[in-house]
Amino acid sequence: MITVDDCNGCNIFIGPTKGSVFLRDCAECRFLIVCQQFRARDCKVVDIFLCCATQPIIESCNDIRFGCFCYNYGALEDQFKNACLSIFNNNWSNIHDFTPAEGERNWSLLPKDARIEDFFPLPSPEKLGDLQIMTDPQSSLVSQTHGCLQRLSMQYCLVVFFADGHAQNRALSLIKELEQTDNILLRTKEILLEEEASERIFGTNAYNKVVKRGPVIGLEYNGKDCISMCLETAKNIATSTGCTGLVYVSTCPKTARKQIENFFSHADVHKIETKS
């Protein structure tokens, strides 16, 4: 566990951590954090750009703002792997408040256009050395998700990539292509699925064999015509890679919401499995 106590007016970066990060009695601070578990207690006026594999928890906190960890540098990918963390398992916006105040909210999400460099000014080139730091969302190792509170329309789409040794690259390719559209990526998750869960999510046993190959990567999209856009993009990627049977895309708006609920509910109640 990494514990940060009694900090005031600090900027703190905590790189990929296999265990938990615990903030206590911090005020007017800004954090960049990647961890398995996150908790804050007795903190106030704190901004946190977070990548957390499990649900973040706050207790007796006030005016805490959360944003998606959108950052990159040369060694970050290896650090994720060494910490056994998946770049697709980020619950940054799904906050549990142990001590909610009636009529008030102790936490909020940072504005969608919040830029990390405005909170964490980059050091001088002399101090940076060859770190190759990038702070724009398009260059981030962790994809920018908009969180469970953001919505553009009533249409949703679930995209699931099955393990074949290239699932991560194909998922990132789809995310990159859809960044050029008006659709938004709400959530991502990398988990193992059993046959029973697979049938409940997809409504068929047709995927029972492929889910046994390893973790699947699920993406939740929202936006007008997001289903048709996801289908077209996934088809183009499948055609170019020759892996036409290793991706699932919702085809019906009426069933997509239920599929998304089943997929992410299953992920929330089961232990996250990551590749070491």
What are the residue ranges of the model-derived segments?
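Extended, compositionally simple hydrophobic/Ser/Thr-rich segments
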Residues: 1-81
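Intrinsically disordered, low-complexity terminal regions
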Residues: 49-276
